[in-house]
Amino acid sequence: MTHFDTIQKGAQQMGAALSDETIQTLVKYLAMLEKWNKAYNLTAIRDVEQMISLHLLDSLATLPYITGDNIIDVGTGPGLPGMVLAICYPEKRFTLLDSNGKKTRFLTQVKMELGIHNATVANERVEKHSHQGEYDHVISRAFASLQDMINWTLPLPKETGNFLAMKGVYPSEEIAALPKEVGLVSVEPLNVPNVQAERHMVVMTRKG
């Protein structure tokens, strides 16, 4: 099975209807990630089939949660899930923020080579990011805890915006320790094809 077929099948299993053009762009992104990873160590995952499942399909599992038009991915790494989402939603705006220069250089190259015009790459620490109160969604796979995520990103969403945290097993202790400034909306399992480990999406909003 080709990488195109694997991505297409996985997306279909999750109910994501992606055009052939979108899947082709994801295949090109995957090829760039594999190539750059050999030199710059962008991800610990080396096997391409695992990259598809653990990175691409895992990122595609978040598609139903992206209902707003202006999104920031904090600690995006090599663009997960932010670059994947930007490829799938060309009509929405994405800011891909990471303090690691190797990773943001890779993203800048992806943006240029693949023509991803709706993504802005920000090489900075989240506390230095000046666009506060502008985002419909603040999404991240990167934070060690929900508390850390909220502490670092609290000023970023609009009043009507939300926080989307991708987690592994149900994070009951982290939920119990959530800062008082946010309210828990939902915790939903993410069913990612070819991924046995538990995955959850935690949705939170800012109070007041």
UniProtKB/Swiss-Prot annotation:
It is an enzyme of class 2 (transferase). InterPro entries: rRNA_ssu_MeTfrase_G, SAM-dependent_MTases_sf. Transmembrane segments: none annotated. It catalyses: guanosine(527) in 16S rRNA + S-adenosyl-L-methionine = N(7)-methylguanosine(527) in 16S rRNA + S-adenosyl-L-homocysteine. Its EC number is 2.1.1.170. It holds the Pfam family GidB. One of its GO terms (molecular function) is rRNA (guanine-N7-)-methyltransferase activity. It comes from the Bacteria. Belongs to the methyltransferase superfamily. RNA methyltransferase RsmG family. This is Ribosomal RNA small subunit methyltransferase G. It comes from Marinomonas sp. (strain MWYL1).
